[in-house]
Amino acid sequence: MFAIIKTSGRQLKVEKDQTIFVEKIDKNEGETITFTDILFINGKIGTPYVENASVTGIIEKQGKAKKIVVYRHNPKSTHKRKLGHRQLFTKVKITELKG
């Protein structure tokens, strides 16, 4: 059994006991989170969401992804710019699919 949820502007296919990485959610590690924007579960297709359906998970970790280096160079001058970015993420383990 699987479900398709919408979170952080993305759609994810999730199953029970699966670990997913989503954008940072303001909760502490060990807390429970419930996703209510369910697009598909048990053969039911939502219009746009399935009513009375939810996916529950436990937050395992809050962290930062690997650094992405952004480099900009203008070849006709000596202008160079180098930046780094580390995206914040939340690691969630799916515990229950209801619906």
From Swiss-Prot:
GO terms for biological process: translation. It comes from the Bacteria. One of its GO terms (cellular component) is ribonucleoprotein complex. Keywords: Ribonucleoprotein, Ribosomal protein, RNA-binding, rRNA-binding. SUPFAM superfamilies: L21p-like (SSF141091). Coiled coil: none annotated. The keyword rRNA-binding applies. GO terms for molecular function: rRNA binding; structural constituent of ribosome. Part of the 50S ribosomal subunit. Contacts protein L20. This protein binds to 23S rRNA in the presence of protein L20. Belongs to the bacterial ribosomal protein bL21 family. This is Large ribosomal subunit protein bL21. It comes from Mesomycoplasma hyopneumoniae (strain 232). The lineage of its organism: Bacteria, Bacillati, Mycoplasmatota, Mycoplasmoidales, Metamycoplasmataceae.
